[in-house]
């Protein structure tokens, strides 16, 4: 039975009775509005479902990333332990093949090697360290595991308390670099005046032959801040913790052993605190930097190198001499600010978006002058083999991509396809709703005209 205004005419008892065909839907326009509302509700539900799934997806990825980081950290710790054991075994093998300390002194021309070795072995234990930088605790509680308190190794007790390492930077006077481990061994030596006394030594060659000095302060470096020599520290940082640490304390023959030992231990204490701060920074960087692709110009290794240089320049405000190229030490603060990761905009904390995670404070209050200490430029030098003890290398070359750490997991190809699909579905639903609404309006107009014509008839 067709819909419309079809009429049939019947006569009953002389009365005209009009019988209209029954209609299936009395109000088609209301039904079209209801269907349109349902479509919009379904579209909104679909949109919010996609948003919720995206948020859940992001949470799941973050959880998987944290689990993967924990596994990598455990693997790195195990690898570091294996490497430490291998290094210890190699050192033990080297110690077995190395000559004894008295024989080495005798070969280098040191007078009375037995007496020197006896004085080195019979030295009194290290005294209590002075307070650390910034009002920290003394060395008795904080440096209990340091190598200064270690007993001499059995079977090799005459060996010096420092180890041979690679020169950093390669500017040592003798071509050999050492890392100081014991203050007693440092203060028991007869030192030369380094590069400052080479001219005097050259002038004295015409006179009677002078005994060649055995050691040079410019050949001995700190353990962590391995670009600072003892010569630079004694000549520039002459009063650590209110101590008198001038060059005369070390270079003067028959000088005070206790004062010299306290000065070297104070320098080692500063170096130890700088290493602790660096390890804290490295752990925070590894915790919050989920991806190494945070910049197109820098990488985490660049950030660590300049941060270490800035940190050491804050603990040791001295001018460095054995450098290929020098820059003002305060410039490293700006280098850290530009090379370390930035805080990117996020859904929760947009107010901090675009700010640097490291901000230099008080740098522009005092303008840079010629009196500022100069530090070694490590920005373009090769990365040192061991930037910190116990810190594992997590990568080689720097990544050179434009994605940042927080946007990388959100702008993957799968999520882009999902967003495009949702937009296409919403566009299709809205187009169908508009087309159906226009059709319903046209049918409703036809029904209205038919009803009016029937009423008139």
From Swiss-Prot:
The cysteines joined by S-S bonds are: 187-260, 225-312, 245-260, 303-340, 323-376, 329-375, 333-360
Does the record bear Transmembrane in its keywords? yes
Segments crossing the lipid bilayer: 40-60, 418-438
Report the GO terms under cellular component. plasma membrane
Would you say which domain of life the source belongs to? Eukaryota
What membrane topology does the UniProt entry give?
A: Multi-pass membrane protein
Q: Where would you find this protein in the cell?
A: Cell membrane
Q: Does this entry carry the keyword Manganese?
A: no
- Gly residues bias located where? 133-142
Instruction: Provide ranges: composition bias, Basic and acidic residues.
Output: 86-98
UniProt keyword annotations, A-Z: Cell membrane, Disulfide bond, Glycoprotein, Membrane, Transmembrane, Transmembrane helix
The record's subunit annotation is: Component of the NALCN channel complex. NALCN complex consists of NALCN and auxiliary subunits, UNC79, UNC80 and NACL1. These auxiliary subunits are essential for the NALCN channel function.
**Similarity comment text for this entry:** Belongs to the NALF family.
Q: What does this protein do?
A: Auxillary component of the NALCN sodium channel complex, a channel that regulates the resting membrane potential and controls neuronal excitability.
Protein name listed in UniProt: NALCN channel auxiliary factor 1
Query: What is the source species?
Result: Bos taurus
Gene name, Swiss-Prot/TrEMBL: NALF1
């Amino acid at each position: 039975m067709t819909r419309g205004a079809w009429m049939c005419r019947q006569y009953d008892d002389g009365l005209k009775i009009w019988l209209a065909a029954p209609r299936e839907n009395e109000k088609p326009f209301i039904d079209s509005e209801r269907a349109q509302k349902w479509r919009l509700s379904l579209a909104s539900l679909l949109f919010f479902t996609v948003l919720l799934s995206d948020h859940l997806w992001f949470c799941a990825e973050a959880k998987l990333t944290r689990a993967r980081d924990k596994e990598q950290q455990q693997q790195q710790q195990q690898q570091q332990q294996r490497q430490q054991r291998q290094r210890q075994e190699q050192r033990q093998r080297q110690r077995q093949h190395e000559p004894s300390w008295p024989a080495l002194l005798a070969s280098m021309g040191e007078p009375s090697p037995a007496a020197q070795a006896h004085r080195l072995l019979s030295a009194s234990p290290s005294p209590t360290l002075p307070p650390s930088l910034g009002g920290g605790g003394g060395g008795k509680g904080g440096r209990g595991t340091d190598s200064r308190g270690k007993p001499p190794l059995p079977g090799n007790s005459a060996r010096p308390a420092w180890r041979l390492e690679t020169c950093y930077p390669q500017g040592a006077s003798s071509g050999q670099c050492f890392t100081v481990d014991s203050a007693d061994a440092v203060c028991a030596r007869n030192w030369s005046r380094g590069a400052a006394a080479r001219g005097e030594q050259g002038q004295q060659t015409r006179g009677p032959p002078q005994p060649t000095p055995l050691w040079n302060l410019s050949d001995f470096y700190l353990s962590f801040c391995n670009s600072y020599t003892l010569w630079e520290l004694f000549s520039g940082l002459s009063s650590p913790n209110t101590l008198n640490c001038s060059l005369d304390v070390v270079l003067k023959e028959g000088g005070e052993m206790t004062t010299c030992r306290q000065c070297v231990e104070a320098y080692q204490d500063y170096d130890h605190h700088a290493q602790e701060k660096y390890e804290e920074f490295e752990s925070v960087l590894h915790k919050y930097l989920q991806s190494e692709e945070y910049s197109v110009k820098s990488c985490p290794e660049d950030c660590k190198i300049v941060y270490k240089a800035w940190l050491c320049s804050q603990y040791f405000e001295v001018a460095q001499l054995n450098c290929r190229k020098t820059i003002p030490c305060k410039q490293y603060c700006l280098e850290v600010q530009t090379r370390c990761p930035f805080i990117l905009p996020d859904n929760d904390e947009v107010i901090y978006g675009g700010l640097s995670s490291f901000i230099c404070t008080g740098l522009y209050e005092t303008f840079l002058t010629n009196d500022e200490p100069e530090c070694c430029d490590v920005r373009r030098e090769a990365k040192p083999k061991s930037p910190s003890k116990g810190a594992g290398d997590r990568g080689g070359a720097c990544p050179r991509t434009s994605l940042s750490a927080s946007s990388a997991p959100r702008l993957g190809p799968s999520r882009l396809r999902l967003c495009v699909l949702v937009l296409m579905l919403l566009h299709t639903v809205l187009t169908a709703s508009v087309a159906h609404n226009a059709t319903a309006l046209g049918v409703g107009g036809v029904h209205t005209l038919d009803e009016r014509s029937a009423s008139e008839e």
